[in-house]
């Protein structure tokens, strides 16, 4: 699996192509899986497949907010989201995995629409998350890596592996 640094070396267009595939890959992975399999955690620390799907959906909401804000503001700061708190607050284990994938798909389409509208200068615009500075260019590498990471986690969870 490529690292964030590997993705950062790729052209932005290649990173976005990777991101375009994620909704279909996630839908294919959960298709035909029982609720018991989707909700099964491989161990006490790791998420079930449906939790991975919900996390990707909600992370996309965060990425979309960044992509809407950064072109319009000078170096905005965003808090670092606590994924486990969000998972508990939004009751991921009670969510419908297919619905989470459908919502992720909708949000991802909007995110990709926003990225296609960015100018070369806007890709260089900076912001921070939890005090860590980055650019929209770096965000695209993070998104591609994040997709790979959590798709792999989702697939392992379906197999009952951590």
Where are these regions (language model features)?
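Acidic/histidine-rich alpha-helical segments that form the ligand environment
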Residues: 18-29, 86-124
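Extreme N-terminal tail/first-helix region
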Residues: 1-21
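Active-site rim elements
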Residues: 10-13, 96-101, 137
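Short helix-to-loop capping/linker segments positioned immediately adjacent to catalytic or ligand/cofactor-binding
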Residues: 36-41, 96-100
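Short, contiguous alpha-helical
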Residues: 2-4, 39-83, 112, 124-162
């Amino acid at each position: 699996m490529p690292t964030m640094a590997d993705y950062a070396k790729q052209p932005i267009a290649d990173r976005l192509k990777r991101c375009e595939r994620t909704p279909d890959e996630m839908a294919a992975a959960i298709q035909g899986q029982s609720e018991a399999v989707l909700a099964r955690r491989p161990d006490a620390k790791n998420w079930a497949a449906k939790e991975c799907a919900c996390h990707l959906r909600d992370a996309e909401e965060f990425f979309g907010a960044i992509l809407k804000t950064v072109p319009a503001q000078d170096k905005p700061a965003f808090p670092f989201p606590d994924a486990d708190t969000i998972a508990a607050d939004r009751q991921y284990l009670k969510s419908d995995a297919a619905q989470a994938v459908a919502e992720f798909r909708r949000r991802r389409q909007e995110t990709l629409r926003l990225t296609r509208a960015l100018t070369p200068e806007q890709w260089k615009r900076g912001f921070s998350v939890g005090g860590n500075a980055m650019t929209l260019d770096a965000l695209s590498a993070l998104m591609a890596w994040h997709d790979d990471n959590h798709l792999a986690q989702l697939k392992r969870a379906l197999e009952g592996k951590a």
